Amino acid sequence: MKLRRFRLEELQKATDNFSHDFLIGHGSFANVYRGTFPVEGTLAIKKPHSEAYTSTEDFRNEVRLLSKVKHENLVALVGFCEETGKKGPKAAKILVYEYVANGSLLDYIIGKGGRSLTWRERVKIAIGAAKGIGHLHEGIRPSIIHRDLKPSNILVGEGFEAKVSDFGLVRTGPVGDESHVTSKVKGTLGYLDPAYCSTFHLTPFTDVYSFGVILLQLLTARPALDSTRAANSTSHIINWARLSIEKGKIGDILDTNLLVQGCNMEMMVKMGEIALRCVVKVPKERPTMSQVRQELEAALKAADDEDLPPPPPAASMGDGDDDQRKSGRIHRSSDSVVSVDGIGLERFHVELDSVSFQSVSLRCLETSISMD
């Protein structure tokens, strides 16, 4: 779709001259406003701060770069506005994007009074965001590094599909194993890759680190940096969560909403393990975004396979069933993961000889079977 060039007057009218009442997002790079147009409907209008672009050519390069970004998990650029106006050459350099009505991931995991995401919705959002970021890294040439990934920049679309937004800090990625050296570190505290901060070398793994932090937030619903622990080594979510994940005690750090609703613990453990691999100190030892996406998809498929209903019981026990009766069988029920008083349980159906009984076993206990 060809980009539309908007007039400044149109944008001012759609936002009541960029009124605070139309403000839907703000950051160090720009403010974002909601505007409604006769033909296009509701759009998101990103008005950068005056110092955002050093030149008109800088802005045009940004538009050309963003016009290449076409993916279902990336917020699409619809058009732009470039006018000199009355206040000099920086007066109107504005980007116009599609509008995503369901807010950002930050609204759901840190909370603005809305409903909590289910474990499956969290995984689905993580997979969608990984697809979008992976497309930036590998799906276009030259590649693009976002370098400001955080929950407020992951929007939630229809059916809880993730849409990565805010490409105000994007930079053309390096070629091959090279890195792009920047003159100034940009991003958000808590999500900034320490390797990038210390070396100024920007690579796709810079985004992978930020994504690892987001995965931890999806699990825990905690901020990346906890101001109440400012003088404590656990003020960062990575340090706070690491030991519990490494010991397999994911329940100690999970969002309590997940424990109350019930969740697939294996999936949560896997997400935590992937998150820790994303934030290892050496960038090249981190997985790529494509690998992250593939592992999340594989873990979700395994969780779905667990939930498949058992095969129907045989009408009669013939000679061919002798070995089956002797060895016994364990089936996962269609509702294999349940929650009782906030504790994840797994339901089994066990058949031994001609005796059949139901049991529920706590995953955290060594006791294999408890009779109903």
Residue ranges and their predicted role:
Residues M1-V96, N102-L106, I110-V123, A129, ...:
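Membrane-proximal cytoplasmic juxtamembrane segment of single-pass receptors
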